[in-house]
């Protein structure tokens, strides 16, 4: 990952976390920032490498006790979006749509 890619993904991650933090409680569990979206849903965002391509992932858990069994939701690749705002909106949609699922 180049420095530019890292800064871009890091910036996107922080922006999404900030927007989720406006509506949800942030809680540190096992050294990771999780957001309590509702009583049955926690989310965690992370940067990963998938198929040698860097992307952001939204992880889902049903409770703090179950974060070790968290499931990866959407994988968000920067090259799939025309703008940073479009990628941020897609990630936020993943989080908010999970509430109604």
Spans of model-derived segments:
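Short intrinsically disordered terminal tails
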Residues: 1-4, 96-101
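Intrinsically disordered, low-complexity regulatory segments enriched in Ser/Thr/Pro
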Residues: 43-86
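N-terminal export/targeting and maturation segments
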Residues: 4-7, 81, 85, 92
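N-terminal regions of proteins, emphasizing targeting and processing segments when present
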Residues: 16, 20, 47, 61-62, ...
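Negatively charged, low-complexity tracts enriched in Asp/Glu with abundant Ser/Thr
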Residues: 1-42, 73-77
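Charge-rich, solvent-exposed alpha-helical interaction surfaces
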Residues: 12-15, 19, 87-94, 98
């Amino acid at each position: 990952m180049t420095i530019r890619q890292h800064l871009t993904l890091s910036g996107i991650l922080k922006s999404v976390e900030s927007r989720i933090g406006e509506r949800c409680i942030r809680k540190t569990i096992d050294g990771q920032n999780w957001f309590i979206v509702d009583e049955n849903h926690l989310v965690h965002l992370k940067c990963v490498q998938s198929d040698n391509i860097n992307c952001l992932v939204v992880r889902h858990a049903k409770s703090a006790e179950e974060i070790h069994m968290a499931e990866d939701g959407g994988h968000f690749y920067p090259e799939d979006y025309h703008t940073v705002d479009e990628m941020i909106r897609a990630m936020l949609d993943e989080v908010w749509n999970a509430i109604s699922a």
